[in-house]
Amino acid sequence: MIRKATVMKVYKDKYDDYKQRHDKLWPEMAEMLKAHGVHHYSIFLLEETGQLFAYLLVEDEDSFSEVAKTEICQKWWAYMAPLMETNDDLSPVSHDLKEVFYLA
């Protein structure tokens, strides 16, 4: 498994909406992620700044790179766009983090 971590940003007045939408994650979104080899996906919020820290395990990069091309992912991005910083294609502005420590 490949460990991945990213940072995104949610608007400060949208924290509750962001959490509520993820609490009710569409079943088809969860199914698609699992079908593309995503496991143990967690998102944490730093309330002082609105930074979101996402951590997930993926089976392989090629399969994971296909997630963004799915129709359900595109719909999810549009649904979440009013709550967070996004790119022109409505994907979240996301910065991959470099792993500097790991204890197995």
From Swiss-Prot:
Q: Which InterPro entries match?
A: Dimeric_a/b-barrel (IPR011008), L-rhamnose_mutarotase (IPR013448), Rham/fucose_mutarotase (IPR008000)
The top EC class is isomerase
What is this enzyme's EC? 5.1.3.32
Q: Which reaction does it catalyse?
A: alpha-L-rhamnose = beta-L-rhamnose
Q: Which SUPFAM superfamilies match?
A: Dimeric alpha+beta barrel
Coarse class of the protein's main subcellular location? cytoplasm
Which keywords describe this protein according to UniProt? Carbohydrate metabolism, Cytoplasm, Isomerase, Rhamnose metabolism
Please give the biological process terms from Gene Ontology that the record holds. Answer: rhamnose catabolic process
Question: One MF term from GO for this chain?
Answer: L-rhamnose mutarotase activity
Quote the pathway field.
Answer: Carbohydrate metabolism; L-rhamnose metabolism
The entry's function note states: Involved in the anomeric conversion of L-rhamnose.
> Would you identify the family this protein belongs to, as annotated?
Belongs to the rhamnose mutarotase family.
* Protein name (Swiss-Prot/TrEMBL): L-rhamnose mutarotase
Upper lineage is: Bacteria, Bacillati, Bacillota, Bacilli, Bacillales
Gene that produces this protein: rhaM
